[in-house]
């Protein structure tokens, strides 16, 4: 169990470390989904509401539904003000989405999979930036924690869908 706990702790830190190390893309370049071992990252330009709408449309086109949007920026901005600290984001949302058929198959394969559900996208704008960054954990990376061939197969399918969703958004926005 210790190994799994360490792996899960590493999973939570990796998005932060990767994003701190990333540079921004050049103006006018074709936006594509950046793939690391752990993450899928897309950066686009535009108002966050347009990006969220494009994401919701793409999610529905892949037969998923949006389970909710957590507006972390509102709460964290108030908390930062209470502590007298700066808040480094103009916007920070977590968009949750799910495909019920795949969720059912996954939970039948391993009920522990529920700890990783639903799919989530961090959608944020750094203070003063015109770019919106969208980040997802790679389902194939997370699925390794469960060591189930069926879960890994489903994770590959979900990951292909997440990449397709991000590619649709990249095609629709600058």
Which role does the model predict for each range below?
Residues 1-10:
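Bacterial N-terminal signal peptides that target proteins for export
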Residues 10-19:
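Bacterial N-terminal signal peptides
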Residues 26-63, 68-70:
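Terminal, regulation- and interaction-focused segments at domain boundaries
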Residues 55, 62-66, 80, 166-173:
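Sec/Tat-exported extracytoplasmic proteins
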Residues 71-116:
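Compact, glycine-rich, soluble single-domain proteins
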Residues 123-127:
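Short, low-complexity Ser/Thr-rich regulatory SLiMs
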Residues 128-138:
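Short, well-ordered strand-loop elements centered on a beta-strand within folded domains, enriched
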Residues 141-157:
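A short acidic/glycine-rich loop-to-helix N-cap element
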